[in-house]
From Swiss-Prot:
The keyword RNA-binding applies. NCBIfam families: ksgA (TIGR00755). InterPro entries: KsgA/Erm, rRNA_Ade_diMease-like_C, rRNA_Ade_Mease_Trfase_CS, rRNA_Ade_methylase_Trfase_N, rRNA_adenine_dimethylase, SAM-dependent_MTases_sf. It is found in: Cytoplasm. Keywords: Cytoplasm, Methyltransferase, RNA-binding, rRNA processing, S-adenosyl-L-methionine, Transferase. Its main location: cytoplasm. The gene is rsmA. This is Ribosomal RNA small subunit methyltransferase A. The keyword rRNA processing applies.
Amino acid sequence: MALGDLLSRSSPDQLTRFLAQVHGHPKKGLSQNFLIDGNILRKILAVSCVEAGDWVLEIGPGFGALTEVLVNQGAHVVALEKDPMFEETLKQLPIDLEITDACKYPLSQLQEKGWQGKGRVVANLPYHITTPLLTKLFLEVPNQWKTITVMMQDEVARRITAQPGGKEYGSLTIFLQFFADVRYAFKVSSGCFFPKPQVSSAVVHMTVKDTFPLEESLHKKFFSLTRAAFGQRRKLLANALKNLYPKDLVFSALNQLNFSEKTRPETLSLDEYLKLFQLLSLNS
């Protein structure tokens, strides 16, 4: 069957008919803005690199428009949906469905349930929990993923793909780029959703690295440094880190990296933060 034949769940008419049947409505508190544009679904599929036989984690499938496309591609889909309103309609698709809060779901259970090897994440993320969900994916099971392709608020997408020196660059940028090569794929207009969100959206594609820059036992300490650095981004970097390291030690490390004492947090790249961390760790 052709892909176009299976895009019925992206139909606004079918969505509104379903909502009428279950006497339901989009829940603002769950960031329920349903994708109703088949062309955008095709673009997400193309960007995601999903192939037949891949297993894919989808968070917040809702009515299942993206789910349906993934299934038609030949993927084995594990879907985590919080709203029980969608349970019966999602069960009509050949997927492994969990009605659960994705923020609380222990991702280690995926392997326990038999999902071996590296999977992919493809999702239209609930915007109010985008950052905690992305953080969770890498903190709980960083070696579980090949790629992560997610829709999010455009402002967040630009933040996590930002380059050093700009106001959008921050600790979340560094966190995600530590684990993956992160690419801004394309923007999505509000007219592609029902109901229309008040913000623009974008799709971001992450190719997860085979090896990470630091051993796992050092991750927490490194991210404590980057969070502290950007927690007070208007301050000089040495002042922002004063609760973690003596100021003269930070000055010395910056000097070794050819940065001045007046360096601000947004100046350093991921590689430079890694070098700074190693110098501070050696001398503290």
